[in-house]
């Protein structure tokens, strides 16, 4: 048994992920990993596109200093439910706006329904540099059919600017696809 600091990751589910990684490395016995190595590594873990809080970078210039930008490549219903649990832990006085881009072969309606009573609005985008994405207009209609206010936007930059103009204190959550998360991170 080892007492560890919390991982440098957002979301309670990450504790389970880290525990699994540690247990796996111990069971493989190929690596001579010491407890102090694990303790040090846990505080330095970075998981790009998984509940990533964007604190610096080019995208920050499109929002107010009070807006929080989160990115997660969640693309299925199970991941959506895990992310919703994390969003439930955030400041309930801040409205959450979702920027959403998804691939065509996903369960769009079920994914979106997970966030029905959590997000204020969904802004849909096409996923750049991908062929098999669901068109933003169709995705927006699905969100509206789930009872969530939704509109389309032409770019992540405009989506961020418009959300920040509407609510300079909002949490902006970008999700729906690992490809989408990657494109957003590339812009940053």
Task: State the predicted function of each range.
Residues 137, 185-188:
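ER/Golgi luminal nucleotide-sugar-dependent glycosyltransferases, focusing on the catalytic module
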Residues 177:
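Active-site-proximal loop/hinge segments that shape catalytic or ion-binding/gating pockets
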Residues 65-71, 77, 112-171:
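C-terminal helical cap/extension that packs against the catalytic core
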Residues 180-182:
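Short, active-site-adjacent cap segments at secondary-structure transitions
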Residues 1-121:
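Nucleotide phosphate-binding/pyrophosphate-handling subdomain across enzymes
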């Amino acid at each position: 048994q080892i007492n560890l600091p919390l991982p440098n990751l957002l979301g309670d589910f990450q504790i389970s992920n880290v525990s699994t990684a540690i247990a796996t490395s111990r069971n493989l016995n190929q690596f001579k990993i010491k407890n102090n190595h694990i303790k040090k590594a846990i505080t330095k873990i970075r998981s790009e596109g998984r509940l990533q809080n964007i604190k610096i970078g080019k995208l920050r210039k499109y929002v107010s200093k009070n807006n929080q930008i989160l990115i997660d490549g969640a693309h299925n219903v199970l991941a959506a439910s895990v992310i919703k649990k994390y969003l439930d832990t955030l400041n309930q006085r801040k409205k959450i706006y979702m920027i959403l881009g998804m691939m065509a072969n996903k369960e769009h309606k079920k994914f979106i329904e997970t966030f029905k009573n959590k997000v204020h609005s969904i802004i849909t985008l096409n996923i750049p540099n991908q062929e098999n994405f669901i068109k933003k207009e169709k995705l927006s209609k699905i969100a509206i059919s789930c009872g969530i206010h939704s509109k389309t936007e032409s770019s992540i930059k405009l989506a961020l600017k418009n959300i920040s103009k509407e609510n300079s204190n909002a949490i902006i959550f970008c999700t729906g696809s690992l490809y989408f998360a990657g494109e957003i991170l590339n812009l940053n």
